Amino acid sequence: MITKADKNATRKKRHARVRAKLTGTAERPRLNVFRSNQHIYAQVIDDVNGVTLVSASTLDKDLALNGTSNIEAATKVGESVAKRAVEKGVKEVVFDRGGYLYHGRVKALAEAAREAGLQF
């Protein structure tokens, strides 16, 4: 009998492998992305102190969204997290794609964050 691999379990393994090499510092924190079926979340994290510096998601009330699980929503979340990070004085980050492929919503969020002023 053939068993189908759980995509989320393989993503978590992939993320753990990447996280073993990636750490965010106060000077260059980690931009983490989490993608669910309904929403997308982004956090700028200082791993040394264990502190989330900035966050944004499609659940934020100040973002005017038509849908929460599309590329346009991911773009707005990327712009929002980048603006909030620049306001806090963070210009450079390490991008953590969370084990997801750099494609679609994850790519849209990353490119929007770059255009809004974050460097990675």
Swiss-Prot record:
Recorded superkingdom: Bacteria
Protein function = This is one of the proteins that bind and probably mediate the attachment of the 5S RNA into the large ribosomal subunit, where it forms part of the central protuberance.
UniProt xrefs under InterPro entries: Ribosomal_uL18_bac-type, Ribosomal_uL18_bac/euk
CDD domains hit by this protein: Ribosomal_L18_L5e
> Which named protein is this?
Large ribosomal subunit protein uL18
GO MF term (any one)? 5S rRNA binding
**Pfam families on file:** Ribosomal_L18p (PF00861)
A GO cellular component annotation here is: cytosolic large ribosomal subunit
The record ties this protein, via HAMAP family, to: Ribosomal_uL18_B (MF_01337_B)
- Is Cell cycle one of the keywords UniProt gives this record? no
UniProt keyword terms in alphabetical order: Ribonucleoprotein, Ribosomal protein, RNA-binding, rRNA-binding
